[in-house]
C-alpha cells in the first residue's frame, strides 16, 4: 500500500510555468500558522487537513512522522479507572468496526482476537524474538504481503541518515533554526540581520558564503546560487533528483521537520504583502542548504523509504491474543494464513486506540446528556432579575457563573468575549493597535482610548519614566562595557526583589501592582466611537450610527436578550493574572486575540448606553428601559474576582443591583476559587482561605501552574441558560446563549458555529494535540524552556519553535494527564430541522462533523437528545 501525500496534487505540473507557488501552497496545509507567544492564539495543528478524516490524518502522521495522535494506552487505562469510559460503548464501537470490514474469518474468532487485543497490552518481547515464531515467519515467506507495504517520501537528509547513520537531518535543522532566529527576531538583539528588509532568502544568500559552520565545499555549492527564491527552490529540487510527481510530498516532509518554525513563517507570510512569499523563501533556504550538505552522497538509488511489513508481530498477535499455536499455523491452508495476517494488520494499534477514543467520547456525551436531562426545567417562566451579566463562553466562566447565580437574583449569559465587535484597540498613550477579536477574523474598526490633551501629556510622561528605566537596564545588559558593571549596580536591588518575591509573593506582588498604578495615575478616558472620515490608517476610526446599532442588535439577539432587561446589565470580559509566565497570553481571552476582554466589554456597554442606539433599537422592537444601565467588568480567571472597569451613573434600581453584586462577590470568589484550586496537584488538604491562595498563585514568580486554563474542555453548549443552569459542568463546557425561537432564518446559529464554534474547536484540538503528542505538538516543560527572539519558546537554544501548550497545562504529574483528550462535542438546543439546515448550508461544518473533527448532538424543544 503506497502512502501518498495527504493532499491531492497535480502530477502533470511543468516546473517551467512557475507552478512551484501552487505546490508550496498545497503543501503548507500540513502545518498550522503559529502566532507569537505574546498573543498566543489557539490553533489546532490539522486545520488544513479537515478534508480528510481524523482517522486518515492519524494514519498518515504515524507513517510519515511516527507521530501518534490517539490517546496512549496509559491515558486510556487511567480514564477507565476513573469511570470515564463505559465498556458497553467500546463493545458497540468494536461491533460497528467489524460490520464495516470484509473478512473470511468466523465472527466469533475475530471478536475473541479483538477483545484480547483491546486490552492494549504490548506483545511480549520474548514472543517476538522467539526462534520458533521467527522460523515460522521464514517458512511462510510465500505469503503475499504486497498489500501491506508502505512507501513514504522523506527528505533526502533523513533518508541518508537512516541508511548511513549520518546525522544529516539534525545538522540541517541546526542551520535552519539559526537562520530563522536571525531573520524573525523581534526583540532579542540590538543588531538585526543584514539585508533583512530584502527578505529572508536574499538576506540569507548575502551571508551564507561567510558562514564558518559550513565546510568549504558546502559554501562552494551555494556560492553562485540563484538570486530568486523560486528559481533556487526549483533548482535544488532538480539537483536532488525529486521528480515532479513527488515534489509536494517532499515539501510536506520538510515543513513537518520543523513545524514550529515553519508555522511561524507561514503566519508571518499572511500578515503583510511584503512577506507573502516568505514560506517559499523558507523552503528555498532549507532545501538549498540540504543540497549543499547531502551533495557528497548523491545520487541515491531510491528516494523513498519502503516500509516492509514484518509478519512476525502479526503471527505473534494471533498466538498471544488469538490462542493459535505455531503447530496450528503450519497446518493452515495458505489462504487462511493470509486472511489472518491481513486481519491482524487491519486491526492495528491505531484502530484499537480509535475504538477506545470513541468509547471515551460516547461515555462523556452520555454523562452530559444525563446531567442535562436531570436538571431541565421550563424556560418560559422567567422572573425579573436584579442584574444580568454576560460572560465570555470560556470554560472558566462556567463555575463562576454557577456560584454567582446560586448566591443572588442574577441571570447570566454566554457570548464570545469580543462581544461581536470587529475592532482593533489602541489603549491610552499607545501607538500600536491590537486586533481584539478572534484570529480567524480581521478588524473593521479602530477604537482609541482618549482623554484631554493635558491629562494625556502628563500620563505619557509618567509612562516614559517607567519605560526609560527598563530600556536603560536592557541597554546596559547588552552593551559590552556596561554589562560588566551591571551586576554590582543592580545586584542589591534585584537580590532584595528575589528574596521578597520568593517568600512573600502575594504581599510583594500586590504592593508592586498598586505602586505601578499609583505612579501611572491613568486618567479617566473615553473612546473614539464616532466614525472619522479622514484617517491615514488602513482601518477607519470609530463607527457610523448604523454600525453602532447593528453591532449592539446582533449581540443582543445572538444571546436572546431582547426583552425583560434587568436594571443592571454587566458585560464581563475576562483576563488572567500571573507572574513570570511566557504563556500569559494563553490564559487571556482567545476571542480577543490573546488579550484581556475588558476593552471590548467597556466599548460595548458604552454603545448600549447611547441614546441614539437605544432609540434605533426601540424602533425595531428591542425596548431597553430607561432605568436599565449597562456597565462593564473584567472577570479575572486566576483569582475569580470581578473588577469593575466602567460604571456610569446608575439609576436607583441599578444601584441596588450593583450593591448586591458587590456584597456577595467575596463569597462567589471563595467558592469558585476553592472549586478550582482543589483541582491543582499542589493541593491535597483543605484550603482555609481560597482567595488568598489564588492571589499567591497569581503573584508567585516560581509558580509553573497559576491556573489550569482551559484544560479538560470537552463540550460547547449552544442554548438557553435554563438548559444547564443547575448543572455542575465542572468547568469543562463552553456556554453560548441561543434562543432558536428568535432565529427563524438560522443565521444566528450559523454565525455562532462559524465564529465562536470554530474558536472553541481550535482551543479543544490544541489541548488535545498537546496532550497526546507533547513531544511534537506540545512545548515541553516550562522549567527548561527558553524564550527566543520575542516569538516563542524552545527547549535549549537549538530546538524547533514549540507550537503547543506546556506540560504543566495538561499534565497532573509525570505519569497522569489532567486534560482528557476528547474531540469537542457541540450540543445545540434547537429543533432537528435547524440542525439539518445548518449542515446543508454550511459545507465546512458538515465536513468537520463527517470527518470526525468535532462531534455534534442536539436537544429538541421536548428535551430529546440526538447524536448526529
Curated annotation (Swiss-Prot):
It is a peripheral membrane protein. The keyword Nucleus does not apply. Zn(2+) binds at residues 392, 394, 574, 589. Its cofactor is Zn(2+). GO terms for cellular component: plasma membrane. It is found in: Cell membrane. One of its GO terms (molecular function) is zinc ion binding. Pfam families: DabA (PF10070). InterPro entries: DabA. Keywords: Cell membrane, Membrane, Metal-binding, Transport, Zinc. Its main location: membrane. Belongs to the inorganic carbon transporter (TC 9.A.2) DabA family. Forms a complex with DabB. Part of an energy-coupled inorganic carbon pump. This is Probable inorganic carbon transporter subunit DabA. It comes from Bacillus cereus (strain B4264). The gene is dabA.
Amino acid at each position: 500500500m503506497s502512502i501518498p501525500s495527504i493532499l491531492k496534487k497535480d502530477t502533470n505540473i511543468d516546473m517551467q510555468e512557475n507552478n512551484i507557488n501552487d505546490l508550496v501552497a498545497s503543501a503548507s496545509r500540513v502545518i498550522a500558522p503559529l502566532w507569537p507567544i505574546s498573543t498566543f492564539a489557539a490553533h489546532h495543528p490539522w486545520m488544513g487537513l479537515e478534508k480528510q478524516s481524523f482517522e486518515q490524518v492519524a494514519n498518515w502522521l504515524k507513517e510519515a512522522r511516527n507521530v501518534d495522535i490517539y490517546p496512549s494506552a496509559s491515558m486510556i487505562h487511567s480514564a477507565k479507572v476513573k469511570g470515564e469510559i463505559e465498556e458497553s460503548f467500546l463493545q458497540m464501537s468494536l461491533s460497528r468496526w467489524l460490520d464495516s470490514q470484509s473478512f473470511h474469518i468466523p465472527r466469533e474468532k475475530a471478536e475473541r482476537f479483538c477483545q484480547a487485543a483491546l486490552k492494549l497490552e504490548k506483545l511480549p518481547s520474548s514472543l517476538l524474538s522467539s526462534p520458533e515464531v521467527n522460523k515460522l515467519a521464514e517458512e511462510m515467506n510465500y505469503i503475499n504481503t504486497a498489500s501491506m507495504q508502505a512507501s513514504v517520501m522523506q527528505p533526502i537528509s533523513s533518508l541518508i541518515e537512516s541508511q548511513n547513520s549520518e546525522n544529516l537531518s539534525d545538522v540541517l535543522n541546526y542551520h535552519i533554526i539559526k537562520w530563522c532566529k536571525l531573520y524573525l527576531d523581534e526583540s532579542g538583539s540590538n543588531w538585526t540581520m543584514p539585508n533583512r528588509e530584502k527578505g529572508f532568502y536574499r538576506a540569507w544568500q548575502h551571508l551564507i558564503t561567510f558562514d564558518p559552520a559550513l565546510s568549504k565545499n558546502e559554501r562552494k555549492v551555494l556560492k553562485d546560487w540563484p538570486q530568486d527564491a523560486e528559481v533556487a527552490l526549483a533548482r535544488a529540487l532538480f539537483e536532488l533528483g525529486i521528480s515532479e510527481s513527488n515534489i509536494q510530498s517532499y515539501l510536506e516532509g520538510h515543513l513537518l521537520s520543523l513545524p514550529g518554525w515553519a508555522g511561524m513563517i507561514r503566519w508571518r507570510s499572511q500578515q503583510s504583502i511584503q512577506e507573502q512569499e516568505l514560506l517559499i523563501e523558507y523552503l528555498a533556504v532549507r532545501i538549498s542548504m540540504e543540497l549543499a550538505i547531502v551533495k557528497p552522497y548523491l545520487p541515491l538509488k531510491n528516494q523513498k523509504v519502503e516500509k516492509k511489513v514484518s509478519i512476525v508481530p502479526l503471527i505473534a498477535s494471533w498466538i498471544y491474543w488469538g490462542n493459535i499455536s505455531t503447530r496450528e499455523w503450519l497446518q493452515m491452508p495458505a489462504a487462511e494464513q493470509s486472511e489472518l495476517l491481513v486481519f491482524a494488520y487491519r486491526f492495528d494499534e491505531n484502530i484499537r486506540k480509535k475504538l477506545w477514543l470513541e468509547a471515551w467520547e460516547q461515555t462523556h456525551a452520555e454523562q452530559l446528556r444525563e446531567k442535562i436531562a436531570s436538571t431541565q426545567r421550563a424556560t418560559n417562566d422567567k422572573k425579573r432579575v436584579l442584574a444580568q451579566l454576560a460572560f465570555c463562553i470560556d470554560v472558566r466562566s462556567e463555575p463562576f457563573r454557577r456560584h454567582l447565580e446560586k448566591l443572588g437574583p442574577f441571570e447570566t449569559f454566554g457570548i464570545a468575549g469580543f462581544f461581536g465587535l470587529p475592532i482593533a484597540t489602541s489603549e491610552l498613550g499607545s501607538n500600536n493597535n491590537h486586533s481584539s477579536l478572534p484570529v480567524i477574523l480581521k478588524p473593521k474598526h479602530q477604537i482609541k482610548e482618549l482623554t484631554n490633551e493635558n491629562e494625556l501629556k502628563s500620563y505619557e510622561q509618567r509612562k516614559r519614566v517607567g519605560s526609560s528605566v527598563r530600556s536603560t537596564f536592557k541597554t546596559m545588559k547588552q552593551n559590552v562595557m556596561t554589562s560588566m558593571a551591571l551586576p554590582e549596580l543592580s545586584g542589591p536591588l534585584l537580590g532584595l526583589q528575589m528574596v521578597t518575591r520568593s517568600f512573600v509573593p502575594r504581599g510583594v506582588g500586590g504592593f508592586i501592582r498598586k505602586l505601578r498604578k499609583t505612579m501611572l495615575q491613568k486618567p479617566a478616558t473615553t473612546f473614539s466611537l464616532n466614525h472619522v472620515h479622514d484617517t491615514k490608517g488602513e482601518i477607519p476610526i470609530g463607527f457610523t450610527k448604523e454600525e453602532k446599532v447593528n453591532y449592539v442588535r446582533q449581540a443582543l439577539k445572538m444571546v436572546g436578550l431582547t426583552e425583560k432587561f434587568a436594571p443592571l446589565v454587566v458585560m464581563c470580559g475576562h483576563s488572567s493574572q500571573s507572574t513570570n509566565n511566557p504563556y500569559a497570553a494563553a490564559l487571556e481571552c482567545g476571542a480577543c486575540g490573546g488579550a484581556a476582554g475588558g476593552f471590548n466589554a467597556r466599548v460595548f456597554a458604552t454603545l448600549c448606553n447611547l441614546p441614539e442606539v437605544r432609540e434605533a433599537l426601540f424602533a425595531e422592537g428591542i425596548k431597553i428601559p430607561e432605568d436599565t444601565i449597562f456597565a462593564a467588568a473584567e472577570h479575572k480567571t486566576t483569582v475569580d474576582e470581578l473588577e469593575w472597569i466602567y460604571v456610569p451613573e446608575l439609576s436607583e434600581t441599578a444601584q441596588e443591583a450593583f450593591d448586591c453584586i458587590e456584597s456577595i462577590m467575596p463569597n462567589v470568589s471563595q467558592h469558585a476559587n476553592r472549586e478550582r484550586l482543589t483541582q491543582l496537584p499542589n493541593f491535597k488538604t483543605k484550603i482555609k482561605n481560597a482567595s488568598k491562595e489564588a492571589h499567591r498563585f497569581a503573584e508567585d514568580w516560581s509558580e509553573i501552574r497559576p491556573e489550569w486554563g482551559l484544560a479538560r474542555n470537552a463540550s460547547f453548549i449552544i442554548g438557553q441558560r435554563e438548559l444547564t443552569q443547575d448543572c455542575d459542568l465542572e468547568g469543562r463546557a463552553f456556554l453560548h446563549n441561543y434562543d432558536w425561537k428568535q432565529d427563524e432564518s438560522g443565521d444566528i446559529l450559523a454565525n455562532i458555529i462559524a465564529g465562536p464554534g470554530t474558536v472553541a474547536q481550535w482551543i479543544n484540538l490544541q489541548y488535545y494535540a498537546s496532550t497526546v503528542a507533547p513531544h511534537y505538538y506540545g512545548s515541553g516543560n516550562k522549567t527548561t524552556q527558553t524564550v527566543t527572539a520575542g516569538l516563542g519558546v524552545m527547549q535549549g537554544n537549538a530546538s524547533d519553535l514549540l507550537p503547543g501548550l506546556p506540560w504543566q497545562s495538561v499534565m497532573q504529574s509525570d505519569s497522569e494527564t489532567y486534560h482528557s483528550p476528547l474531540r469537542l462535542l457541540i450540543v445545540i438546543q434547537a429543533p432537528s430541522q435547524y440542525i439539518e439546515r445548518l449542515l446543508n448550508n454550511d459545507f465546512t461544518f458538515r465536513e468537520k462533523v463527517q470527518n470526525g473533527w468535532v462531534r455534534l448532538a442536539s436537544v429538541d424543544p421536548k428535551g430529546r437528545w440526538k447524536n448526529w
